[in-house]
UniProtKB/Swiss-Prot annotation:
<keyword id="KW-0539">Nucleus</keyword>
<feature type="compositionally biased region" description="Low complexity">
    <location>
        <begin position="1"/>
        <end position="18"/>
    </location>
</feature>
<comment type="function">
    <text>Histone H3-like nucleosomal protein that is specifically found in centromeric nucleosomes. Replaces conventional H3 in the nucleosome core of centromeric chromatin that serves as an assembly site for the inner kinetochore. Required for recruitment and assembly of kinetochore proteins, mitotic progression and chromosome segregation. May serve as an epigenetic mark that propagates centromere identity through replication and cell division.</text>
</comment>
<dbReference type="InterPro" id="IPR000164">
    <property type="entry name" value="Histone_H3/CENP-A"/>
</dbReference>
<dbReference type="InterPro" id="IPR007125">
    <property type="entry name" value="Histone_H2A/H2B/H3"/>
</dbReference>
<dbReference type="Pfam" id="PF00125">
    <property type="entry name" value="Histone"/>
</dbReference>
<dbReference type="GO" id="GO:0043505">
    <property type="term" value="C:CENP-A containing nucleosome"/>
</dbReference>
<dbReference type="GO" id="GO:0030527">
    <property type="term" value="F:structural constituent of chromatin"/>
</dbReference>
<dbReference type="GO" id="GO:0000776">
    <property type="term" value="C:kinetochore"/>
</dbReference>
<feature type="compositionally biased region" description="Low complexity">
    <location>
        <begin position="37"/>
        <end position="56"/>
    </location>
</feature>
<feature type="compositionally biased region" description="Basic and acidic residues">
    <location>
        <begin position="23"/>
        <end position="36"/>
    </location>
</feature>
<dbReference type="InterPro" id="IPR009072">
    <property type="entry name" value="Histone-fold"/>
</dbReference>
<keyword id="KW-0832">Ubl conjugation</keyword>
<dbReference type="GO" id="GO:0000070">
    <property type="term" value="P:mitotic sister chromatid segregation"/>
</dbReference>
<protein>
    <recommendedName>
        <fullName>Histone H3-like centromeric protein CSE4</fullName>
    </recommendedName>
</protein>
<comment type="similarity">
    <text>Belongs to the histone H3 family.</text>
</comment>
<dbReference type="GO" id="GO:0000775">
    <property type="term" value="C:chromosome, centromeric region"/>
</dbReference>
Length: 211
């Protein structure tokens, strides 16, 4: 019985050592595979970097300055280069010069066809509803007229909204008056409006005082 138990214990210890050796071998193989994979990745990265550098600088520097000049037409001394007189012996490249422009001749301005700018201004004014008279000069004119009527001792003061309302009404009146004046000029087979056209338009409107 003692002999059998010793044999069984020896088998168990032998099996344990063999399993441990197999585990160590597997671990070593795994480490080797990881190391090879890392080396492959590093090699690929270096190759990509080298390819990127070659793409960024496609011109490969030559060994000497004379060979650089013969290949690429450049001459540049670098540390260790032999100074030669190749560049001085070769003729210089001539640059093409632009013809001189005579500055004394005035530049001709672009001329539009008659009526083009007028139609552009008409479209611009028809699209907008902004005030066409400057606000400050109009306000000064309103204050001046009011002072002429009531005198400076009265102390008349104006609100900005009141002056704005007067300006809106004044511009609307002038626009409609000029529209009627233009119709009177067209009726007279003319293009230019005159004072008599304004007088006729105001007389047709029934306004008593005439310009």
């Amino acid at each position: 019985m003692a002999r059998l138990s010793g044999q069984s214990s020896g088998r168990q210890t032998g099996q344990g050592t063999s399993a441990e050796a197999i585990r160590q071998q597997r671990e070593e193989l795994r480490r080797q595979r990881e190391l090879r994979l890392q080396q492959q990745q590093q090699a690929e990265r270096q190759q990509q970097r080298q390819q990127y550098r070659t793409e960024q600088s496609p011109i490969v520097p030559a060994a000497t300055s004379s060979s650089r000049y013969s290949q690429f037409g450049i001459y540049r001394n670098q540390p260790g280069d032999v100074v030669d007189t190749l560049a001085s012996s070769l003729p210089r490249r001539t640059t093409t010069t632009r013809p001189e422009v005579n500055r004394t001749v005035p530049r001709v301005k672009k001329r539009y066809r008659p009526g083009t700018k007028a139609l552009r201004e008409i479209r611009q004014y028809q699209k907008s509803t902004d005030l066409l008279i400057r606000k400050l000069p109009f306000a000064r004119l309103v204050r001046e007229i009011s002072l002429d009527f009531v005198g400076p001792s009265y102390g008349l003061r104006w609100q900005s909204n009141a002056i704005l309302a007067l300006q809106e009404a004044s511009e609307s009146f002038l626009i409609h008056l000029l529209e009627d004046t233009n119709l009177c000029a067209i009726h007279a087979k003319r293009v230019t409006i005159m004072q008599k056209d304004i007088q006729l338009a105001r007389r047709i409107r029934g306004q008593s005082w005439i310009l």
